[in-house]
Amino acid sequence: MAEPVLEDTYLTFSSDFDYIAIAPSPFDNFCNSNSDQVRNSISDLRFLIDDDDSFDDLYFPSENESFCIPPDATKREMSGDFTPASGISGDCVNEDTEKNTNGVLISTSSCYNRESPTDSDFSGTSQSLSFSGQDSAKRKTEIEEDSSDESRRLGKDGFASVIKVGGEEDDEKKKNVRLVRNRESAHLSRQRKKHYVEELEDKVKNMHSTISELSSKMSYFVAENVTLRQQMGTRFSSGPPMVPIVYPWMQYPAYMVKPQGSQVALLPIPRLKPKHSVAKVKKFKKVASFSVFGFLFCMFLFGALVNISYGEYKSNYVTDGVYDQSRGRVLVVDSSRVHCGGDSDQGVGRNVSETENLGPPRNSSEPLVASLFVPRNEKLVKIDGNLIIHSVLASEKARDSETKNEEGKSVLATTTKTLSPALPLPDSTSPRTRDVSKHLYSETGKGLSSSGSDDASNDQLKSTIANGKMQQWFREGVAGPMFSSGMCTEVFQFDVSSNSGAIIPASPHTQQCKNTSDTQKGKKNRRILSGGLPVSDFNLTKEDHNSSSKDKFRETKPGPSMVVSVLVDPREGGNGDIDGMMGGTKPQSRVFIVVLVDGVKYITYSCVLPRPDVPHLMTS
């Protein structure tokens, strides 16, 4: 079909612009354009742009590459299918042209709205159109061949930019959404990379600052270690260095020889200390602590059992085995006849001197605390028996003084003069004390045989009161019936022997003066045996001393029987009315009397007391 050539009288183009290929409008139909067509007009350009908005993938021909323009393009005139209308303005001319512009095949469909000329003008122009059907057919075939070759070449190079007219709206929307999403993701990824790089830079800076600080500290420590090593080396240096030796063959002056080792301080090499030494020290400390604690525990354990009392009374032989305790006061026998060369003006009731009494001084009015267990009615009865020991000692002194009694007084009178009170009265001048003291003394014979003389007792009482020394050893009544043989029963007895554990009688006074070197002391303490018995006679650990004691015991003359103590049952005693003495209104029904027979045997009797008007014996 021949295409008519349209000669536009209204538009005048220069010769330079006649053959320039102008890109057609991207709109599908300009006359029927609306909002949807305008919105989708951009999607017709099938240029795929990267996220970084670069045109690296686009193909641009080089300068030497020629455009794909057909050779007869210069002779070609603008032609198109023209359909005349009936003189109505705004006729649409649908012109479909296919041109090869810059090697790109473009298919456009455009609508031109122009003023329709008058009928006269249109007739003039139609006459000037020339139809050449053969030329147009040839031109179409050439254009198709060129376009196929060009598309084939672009496919090989990996670039095909063919814009198709009309597409589905869904595909266009998806492409737009994908493009926006890609751009946003690219922007976010760039921001993340930027922040990550900034954080890495901050960390690197911090690491560099930390490394610099550590290096400075290390250098400081090294320098300090070097100074300390130098100080230690100078402190323990053996002496100045040796002077360099000048050898005779050296023609030049002597030079300093470099000593062994380098002058530069070496870095300290840490050495691990052996662990076994520390373990040994800890083990030694543990053993020492355990031993100390064990020693202290033993001291506390055995210290509580051992009675540590320096200078106190030590129980003697039989008293430990027979009697429970013996804490009573020791009687002091002190007179001019007992001591060899002693002072005659010393009183009977003086205390022991400080050199002889190692224990603390006691009050003379302190009550005697002692006990004696006696079998009675198939039971053991506890009796206050502290006076037995003192009675034995008093009897020994009485027998010694009996041989040298020039005035011919009885044994009991001599004993009462030489004994100090065991239980003193607080005040002898008070009427009540004087009334009680009348019933405290009697002779030994009268107490045993219930027959005696009142004159002897009266003389004894008068002499005692006249001297001011009220003896309170026996607490018996002066008047009234006394004991009979049917009223007393023997409880137990024990002999005085020289064997270990027995009571040894005192030797005569003449032998004590001859055998004792300490004869100038005026006070005698029988508790610590200071002069009462010779040292050689009292030592029972050696056989010769035991034999000498036996000889002295055999030489001792048996004396008459005497009462050494009178004991009462503490269960039958009442509370004392007078301070410091045994007394009470409750009468006693039974007493225990200790008698020394022939100076070698002590017999304890249990006697039943009669019930007179006046109580004979009072106890606390």
Curated annotation (Swiss-Prot):
Where is the protein localized?
Endoplasmic reticulum membrane; Nucleus
What sections of the protein cross the membrane? Answer: 288-308
Q: Where is this region: Leucine-zipper?
A: 211-218
Region annotation Disordered: residue ranges?
109-155, 343-364, 398-460, 505-557
Residue interval(s) of motif RRIL cleavage motif: 526-529
Segments for region (Basic motif): 173-205
- Segments of skewed composition (Polar residues): 109-135, 352-364, 447-460, 508-519
On the Lumenal side, which residues? 309-620
Indicate which residues are glycosylated according to the record. Answer: 351, 363, 515, 539, 546
Q: Where is the composition biased (Basic and acidic residues)?
A: 398-409, 432-441, 540-557
Q: What's the protein's topology in the membrane?
A: Single-pass membrane protein
Identify the CDD domains for this entry.
bZIP_HY5-like
Q: Topology: which residues are Cytoplasmic?
A: 1-287
Q: Which ranges carry the bZIP domain? A: 172-235
Q: Which GO terms describe its cellular component?
A: endoplasmic reticulum membrane; nucleus
Q: Which GO terms of the molecular function aspect are on file?
A: DNA binding; DNA-binding transcription factor activity
Enumerate the UniProt keywords alphabetically.
Answer: Activator, DNA-binding, Endoplasmic reticulum, Glycoprotein, Membrane, Nucleus, Stress response, Transcription, Transcription regulation, Transmembrane, Transmembrane helix
Q: What do we know about how this protein assembles, alone or with others?
A: Interacts with BZIP28.
Q: Which family does it belong to?
A: Belongs to the bZIP family.
Q: Main role? A: Transcriptional activator involved in stress responses.
Name this polypeptide is given: bZIP transcription factor 49
What species is given as this protein's source? Arabidopsis thaliana (Mouse-ear cress)
- State the gene name recorded for this protein: BZIP49
